[in-house]
């Protein structure tokens, strides 16, 4: 039972770190969200993104 709980905690921690690395700010300057769509598509494979504080954020 102790090993199962340790494995579960390790799985949660790894999942959180993978999700936070996969999405986020990329080094592309922008003034409108449409400028981020192509850049996000190239970086993450998904065209979902928005301009936030003059920097693209991909989802």
Swiss-Prot record:
Q: Name one GO cellular component term.
A: extracellular region
Q: Which Pfam families match?
A: Toxin_2 (PF00451)
Q: Give a yes or no for keyword Signal in this entry.
A: yes
- Domain-level remarks: Has the structural arrangement of an alpha-helix connected to antiparallel beta-sheets by disulfide bonds (CS-alpha/beta).
Main location, first listed in the record: secreted
- Which InterPro entries does this chain map to? Scorpion_toxin-like_sf (IPR036574), Scorpion_toxinS_K_inh (IPR001947)
* Signal peptide region: 1-22
Q: Which family does it belong to?
A: Belongs to the short scorpion toxin superfamily. Potassium channel inhibitor family. Alpha-KTx 16 subfamily.
Misc remark: Negative results: has no effect on rat Kv1.2/KCNA2 channel.
Q: What does this protein do?
A: May play a role in blocking voltage-gated potassium channels Kv1.2/KCNA2, and Kv1.3/KCNA3. Blocks the voltage-gated potassium channel Kv1.3/KCNA3, with an IC(50) of 118.3 +-55.8 nM.
Q: Name one GO molecular function term.
A: toxin activity
Q: Positions of the site: Aromatic residue of the functional dyad?
A: 59
Task: Specify the protein name.
Answer: Potassium channel toxin alpha-KTx 16.7
List cystine links.
Answer: 30-51, 36-56, 40-58
User: What tissues harbor this protein?
Assistant: Expressed by the venom gland.
- Could you tell me where this protein is found in the cell? Secreted
Q: What organism is listed for this UniProt entry?
A: Mesobuthus gibbosus
Q: Where is this site: Basic residue of the functional dyad?
A: 50
Q: Which UniProt keywords apply?
A: Disulfide bond, Ion channel impairing toxin, Potassium channel impairing toxin, Secreted, Signal, Toxin, Voltage-gated potassium channel impairing toxin
């Amino acid at each position: 039972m102790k090993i199962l709980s340790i494995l579960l905690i390790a799985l949660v921690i790894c999942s959180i770190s993978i999700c936070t690395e996969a999405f986020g700010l990329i080094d592309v300057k922008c003034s409108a969200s449409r400028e981020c769509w192509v850049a996000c598509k190239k970086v993450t494979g998904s065209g979902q993104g928005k301009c936030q504080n003059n920097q693209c954020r991909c989802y």
